[in-house]
Design a protein with these regions (language model features):
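Helix-to-loop junction immediately C-terminal to a conserved catalytic motif
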Residues: 98
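Catalytic Walker B motif of ABC-type/P-loop ATPase nucleotide-binding domains
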Residues: 206-209
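Hydrophobic anchor residue at the start of the ABC signature
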Residues: 195
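Conserved ABC transporter NBD signature motif
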Residues: 106-116
Length: 257
């Protein structure tokens, strides 16, 4: 893990702006040549929050949360559910952990390293081999087909064989949508494509932000099974967020945001 597979092409990108504008899991693939984080441990074991709080909540005195203003640890190999009400900072939490935003108070650290000290190249490296993210808003490319959205990432990571990807499409009931543009698919179908894309890379933690909000019970259950099978095979931790509807899994700990 952490090494570029042989015979896998890559796009050299010296533009920080381009990396930032791409979804984190896609943008990561554009930096195979980036230097490693100094002292970076190849496997990330813990994500820790200490008195973290979105700055927008700083003047509020009514915060009642099991995450904000608390000391919280997410450990590799474990399964967590973060339940939230609207406007409580659920997506902000994901954005902080994935490095998209830093407008928070307190400390967030990976294996005791304060993430505020990470530079863009460091985040690229983390997203390449340690963090995968299923966005609530998905961030798929509408002009590309379902398979192309997955392949654009997998071609760069070289992590999964085409046969495995197609098997996931079939299992999730979208095997007939492989070559259909994303713009012509329902949001629920797009959610399944986004999940597959999130799985075609190595990761120590997977953040799934409302992954089944538009799925029926059967597809939600299948997605959960596929997600957990891949996470277990990598020994990874999984953090699922929800505003009510969530994947029925054996969560080891549930936090009320």
């Amino acid at each position: 893990r952490g090494r570029r597979p042989e015979n896998v092409g890559f796009v050299r990108c010296d533009s920080v702006a381009l990396i930032r504008c791409l979804p984190s899991d896609i943008g990561a693939a554009y930096a195979w040549e980036s230097e490693s984080i100094e002292g970076f441990i190849e496997i990330m074991d813990k994500i820790e929050l200490k008195n973290a709080l979105p700055e927008v909540f700083a003047l509020r005195d009514d915060i009642r949360s099991e995450i904000w203003h608390q000391e919280v640890t997410f450990e590799r190999g474990h399964l967590y559910l973060v339940e939230a009400g609207s406007g409580t900072g659920k997506s902000s939490l994901c954005s902080y952990i994935i490095g998209y935003r830093n407008d928070y108070q307190g400390i967030i650290s990976f294996d005791r390293r304060n993430i505020r000290n990470y530079k863009v190249k460091d985040w690229v490296e983390l997203r390449k081999r340690s963090l995968s993210h299923l966005f609530q808003e998905l961030r798929l490319f509408p002009e590309l087909t379902a398979y192309e959205n997955v392949a654009i990432k997998n071609n760069l990571t070289g992590f999964k064989k085409k046969k495995q990807i197609e098997a996931w499409f079939d299992a999730l009931g979208i095997g007939d949508k492989l070559h259909v543009p994303i713009s012509r698919m329902s949001f629920g179908q797009q959610q399944r494509v986004a999940m597959i894309r999130a799985l075609v890379q190595p990761f120590d933690f997977l953040l799934a932000d409302e992954p089944i909000s538009h799925l029926d019970e059967e597809n939600g259950r299948t997605m959960g099974e596929i997600m957990m099978e891949e996470a277990r095979s990598q020994g990874a931790g999984v953090i699922v967020t929800s505003i009510g509807k969530h994947i029925a899994l054996d969560y080891e700990k549930t936090f009320r945001l």
